[in-house]
């Protein structure tokens, strides 16, 4: 794109340069800038009259149409002085784009910069530019409460539940969590007493920009009739006839979306586990599996409906 007229910003004024890494986790629907959501950062202070240059780098696998309220910015490209003016720029995956604008809004105030994909914005991919020495806004008699209302978007917690009913029992899992903290649960129950049951609960926090690491504390309940004294692969005895233990561990997402889980319980027993959900075998056929050093194995083959495609 090329502008019909020169779009140079004023010269001889201070320049504020910002580097924004567009980041996120596609599996958890968490989107951020520089690894932090809107509510996890302070407003960006700018001065009236200065030039603001933003270097945007998209490190995700999705495109992000980044939109700035209240200002047109220069989309810096090979046309130099004739770079076009825009208020939204679509950043392609693994691409870098430089934009710049002059902070010339006479009313000053607060201006939102965010991804224009709605759920990306609501999960935290945005920043607020605030002019220094802005006069009070008569439409916002309580500015702090108003700001908290904006921050509430990416502070929400969501509940997801899956349960598979089989001929001899059911297997399920749930998660109730937000951007960082998460409560997770898993269970396997049989319809007959001889099948027993097993349930786990975890409270943990996702660490890092990609959120691959999840350290946690939790509880484990196990009952299987007639299986007292079974040994795991580390030659440690497990009391599966009736057992309630606290656990401390960590989960890590590996390549191919495999999840490795390492934990130790209050009896000193160690368990290593590898699992993967929703492996696409065909357009409708899916596979999930789990195996661990307690000699527990599960494999689930199922079909997905058209709504999942």
Regions found by a protein language model. Give the residues of each.
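Copper-binding active sites and cupredoxin-like electron-transfer domains
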Residues: 1-159, 163, 169-171
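Conserved small/polar residues in nucleotide/adenosyl-binding loops
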Residues: 302-309
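Transmembrane beta-strands of outer-membrane beta-barrel proteins
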Residues: 159-163, 183-185, 213-217, 258-262, ...
């Amino acid at each position: 794109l090329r502008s019909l007229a020169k779009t140079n910003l004023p010269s001889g004024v201070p320049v504020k340069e910002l580097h924004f890494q567009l980041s996120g986790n596609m599996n958890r629907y968490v989107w951020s800038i520089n690894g932090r959501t809107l509510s996890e950062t302070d407003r960006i202070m700018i001065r009236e009259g200065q030039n603001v240059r933003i270097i945007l780098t998209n490190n995700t696998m999705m495109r992000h149409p980044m939109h700035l309220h209240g200002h047109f910015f220069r989309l810096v490209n090979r046309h130099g002085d004739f770079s076009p003016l825009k208020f939204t720029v679509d950043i392609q995956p693994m691409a870098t784009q430089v934009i710049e604008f002059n902070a010339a809004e006479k009313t000053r105030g607060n201006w939102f910069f965010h991804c224009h994909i709605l759920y990306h914005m609501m999960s935290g991919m945005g920043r607020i530019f605030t002019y220094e020495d802005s006069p009070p806004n008569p439409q916002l008699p309580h500015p702090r409460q108003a700001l908290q209302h904006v921050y509430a978007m990416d502070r929400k917690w969501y509940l997801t539940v899956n349960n598979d009913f089989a001929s001899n029992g059911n297997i399920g899992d749930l998660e109730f969590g937000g951007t960082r903290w998460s409560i997770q649960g898993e269970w396997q129950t049989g319809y007959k007493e001889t099948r027993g049951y097993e349930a786990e609960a975890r409270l943990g926090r996702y660490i890092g920009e990609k959120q691959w690491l999840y350290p946690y504390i939790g509880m484990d309940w196990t009952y299987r009739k007639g299986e007292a004294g079974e040994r795991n692969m580390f030659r440690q005895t497990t009391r599966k006839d009736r057992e309630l233990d606290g656990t401390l561990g960590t989960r890590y997402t590996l390549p191919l979306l495999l999840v490795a889980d390492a934990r130790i319980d209050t009896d000193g027993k160690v368990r290593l586990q590898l699992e993967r959900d929703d492996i696409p075998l065909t357009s409708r056929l899916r596979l999930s599996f789990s195996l661990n050093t307690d000699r527990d194995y599960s494999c689930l083959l199922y079909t997905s409906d058209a709504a999942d495609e």
